[in-house]
Amino acid sequence: MTEPELTIGQFGPADAVKSLPRRSAGAHKWSVGGVMIVAGAPGYVGAAILCAMAAGRAGAGLVNLAVHRPWIPSIAPVVPEASFTILPDGDLGSTSSRLLDTVSVKAAKCAAFVVGPGLGDDDYARQLVSALLGISARRQGASLGFGSTQAQSANDHVGKSLLDYERPIVVDADGLNALATIDDWWVRLPEQRLVLTPHVGEMSRLMDLPTNQIIAEPEWVAIAAANRFRQSILLKGNPTLVTDGRTLFRAIDSPPSLATAGSGDVLAGTIGALLAQGLSLIDAANLGVFAGIRAARRLEADLGTLGVIAGDLPRAIAIELAALERA
């Protein structure tokens, strides 16, 4: 198969320093950038915790977790900095308007969103992702949101999907699995609003391709996905690839310590925080991968390749970002 013509490169230390967010002396939490994370399900509350910890350590001014009420007592002691939006229970097919009304209160003030870590692979998760991205039936009068600003009143945001705010969204894990069940979902979304972060299995479901083809031709598949979906793609693997269909970046280093549950949740939270601070889709994805690889190598020096767990990564990523800030 033939790749379309595009620019190919690597994202190195100089690129990382150049893209790193910088805070002004008068910054406050909302000017830095808040991120809303829609994550967690029974048995997967840790995904929400890891994603939120990573977002905070990567510089988000505020982290808001959209979760179900029963998970809050488990999450709050571990991530006391987070605030919460309580998701409604029950069949969202009949309550999607209530969901959007609930989420809108905090979403209107956030600069980026993360959807998917640990949401579960069930009808509720699929309905949730569909409603949040505006793919399901929309309330009368809701549009694709051109011209909305953070200064608008809360009432101006009632019933809007996350896309209505014209802010970037990371779709990860079960968010990707939900999209894979919706025919032609991409034609209903604006271009270059999402960073999709699949591993090989999730990409197989998104593209309806066998995993062996993705492993054999990862660059072609990543580019094809970016062009089909008209979004930015971060295909995890060896190498990890970042592309918007016009440029392709390869992260050649692949620390074996990252082969651990939760590392993808950390990456999603890191990218969400970087997007909230104003980075482009491609720069946020690249810097998230770069810092995550550096953090893993730092941890391997002390813990080896076997002893690193995902909970070690957020602080190590913060240390790597601090080193870039001093460079």
Where are these regions (language model features)?
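Short, small-residue alpha-helix embedded
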Residues: R205, T260-A291
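Charged C-terminal helix
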Residues: R294-A327
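A short, basic/flexible loop-to-alpha-helix module at the beginning of a structural domain
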Residues: V17-G33
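Glycine/charged-rich beta-loop-alpha catalytic/anionic-binding loops adjacent to active sites
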Residues: S31-I37, R246-S257
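Glycine-rich phosphate/dinucleotide-binding loop and adjoining beta-alpha-beta core of small-molecule
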Residues: M1-P13, A66-D253, A322-R326
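Short glycine/serine/threonine-rich phosphate/pyrophosphate-binding segments
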Residues: G43-A58, L62-N64, D122-A125, L176-T181, ...
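Substrate-binding N-lobe of the ribokinase-like
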Residues: H28-S83, D89-G90
